[in-house]
């Protein structure tokens, strides 16, 4: 009797195994056929359905295979088959995830996709995918609501890093500040390559260079040849004034990274690193590379690079090149302002201080630049005249020639009757009066006029000693 019992059980088990094997074989055939776009893929899927109509998991696999091939009709069909096969019926969370993915990827109704994901959450609140997918869909409507949904996930999915998930939502929404703040709270050791990529970028572009470097170094442990991690490790080290460390990444970035497309910004930053290290040859070479690559769509503009090159030559007292690149800068900057015009005057002034033989010529060019500033930008007319006078003083330090007199007189004419003078205007007026007072007393031999200017100075600054001395003269 026992022998018969065992024979019956063995037969049942063999039958079950054979059925299971057949189901799996039909499923695999369908999956392979869909993936390879076989002509009979639909027929293979139909056969697999007949063999697996009670296997919800298998039916979702077929639906996902169709979704990967952008066959949304069959993806939806098999999602519904899976939902019917689920226990309880129509409460199978993976089926709703699939329906949501179809709508989110190829549909036009984000609300409908979010509805499917909500049903997935309701039927399996311990599966983090529903929360994450709902948040990804809803981020376009309200990133803060999407973040709140992920907070709901925390209670039911304690193993999930919600800080990283929330940060990802904000990054996709273009809110780098919120992305950074949430990544900064996440456990960096649990972040994958994609999260670290977002962490390093959100940190760098919000000015948190310590965290940018930390994220880049963590990413390089996972993928040493990653271009983004090497690039931003180089940039972050520069911003942290770790110039030798920044230099160590120059070779790595340009020679030991995969899929790196080098830009004008890369070469510009590299030039700044070499500049900080006083490596002038490499600095100028990198500036040249940056200028050869820059175009209208570049992150950094041509005029900004030209200005940096000019500043570098000025620092090196290479005045010819400083002027050349500064004039190129002025020629290509779209909207010039008075500071740009004054920059030209300042280069000529510094050059004059370092070239006695050409001093008169160069001061003349500085004065000309200031006069142009006053003409182009009338709001700077007073300041322009004052600076022209200051330049003239470099050629007439005692004031005997009176070179600065016309410009100081212009300052006085523009300011002395101005009712609402600010502190800087009072300062310019006071020193203009001082020059005219000294000129009248020392070279004009006109004590009365000198005293007149002295009284005007004391009305501005009662404690100004030189004016007090002139006033007290008998």
Feature map (PLM): residue ranges:
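Alpha-solenoid helical repeat scaffolds
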Residues: 2-8, 12-443, 469-474
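Eukaryotic acidic, Ser/Thr-rich intrinsically disordered low-complexity regions
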Residues: 457-474
């Amino acid at each position: 009797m026992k022998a018969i019992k065992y024979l019956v059980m063995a037969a049942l088990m063999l039958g079950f195994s054979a059925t299971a094997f057949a189901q799996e074989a039909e499923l695999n055939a369908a999956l392979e056929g869909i993936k390879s776009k076989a002509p009979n893929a639909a027929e293979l899927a139909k056969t697999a359905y007949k063999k697996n109509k009670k296997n919800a998991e298998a039916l979702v696999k077929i639906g996902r295979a169709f979704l990967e091939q952008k066959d949304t009709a069959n993806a939806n069909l098999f999602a519904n088959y899976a939902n019917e096969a689920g226990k309880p019926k129509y409460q199978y969370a993976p089926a709703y995830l699939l329906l949501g993915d179809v709508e989110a990827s190829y549909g036009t109704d984000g609300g409908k996709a979010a509805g499917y994901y909500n049903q997935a959450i309701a039927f399996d609140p311990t599966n983090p995918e529903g929360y994450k997918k709902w948040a990804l869909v809803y981020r376009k409507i309200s990133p803060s609501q999407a973040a709140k949904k992920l907070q709901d996930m925390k209670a039911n999915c304690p193993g999930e890093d919600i800080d990283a998930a929330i940060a990802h939502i904000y990054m996709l929404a273009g809110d780098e500040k919120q992305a950074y703040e949430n990544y900064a709270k996440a456990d960096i050791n649990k972040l994958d390559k994609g999260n670290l990529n977002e962490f390093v970028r959100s940190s760098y572009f919000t000015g948190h260079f310590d965290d940018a470097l930390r994220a880049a170094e963590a990413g390089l442990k996972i993928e040493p040849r990653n271009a983004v991690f090497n690039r931003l490790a180089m940039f972050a080290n520069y911003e942290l004034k770790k110039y030798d460390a920044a230099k160590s990444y120059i070779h790595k970035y340009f020679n030991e990274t995969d899929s790196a497309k080098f830009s004008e910004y890369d070469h510009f930053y590299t030039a700044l690193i070499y500049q900080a290290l006083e490596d002038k040859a490499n600095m100028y070479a990198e500036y040249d590379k940056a200028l050869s690559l820059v175009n209208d769509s570049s992150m950094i503009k041509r005029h900004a690079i030209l200005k940096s090159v000019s500043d570098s030559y000025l620092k090196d007292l290479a005045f010819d090149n400083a002027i050349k690149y500064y004039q190129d800068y002025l020629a290509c900057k779209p909207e010039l302002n008075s500071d740009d015009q004054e920059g030209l005057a300042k280069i000529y002034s510094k050059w004059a201080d370092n070239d006695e033989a050409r001093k008169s010529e160069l001061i003349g060019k500085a004065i000309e630049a200031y006069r142009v500033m006053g003409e182009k930008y009338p709001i700077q007319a007073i300041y322009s005249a004052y600076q022209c006078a200051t330049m003239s003083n470099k050629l007439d330090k005692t004031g005997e020639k009176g070179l600065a007199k016309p410009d100081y007189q212009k300052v006085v004419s523009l300011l002395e009757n101005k009712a609402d003078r600010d502190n800087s205007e009072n300062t310019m007026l006071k020193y203009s009066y001082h020059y005219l007072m000294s000129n009248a007393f020392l070279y004009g031999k006109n004590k009365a006029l000198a005293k007149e200017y002295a009284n005007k100075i004391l009305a501005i600054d009662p404690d100004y000693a030189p004016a007090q001395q002139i006033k007290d003269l008998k």
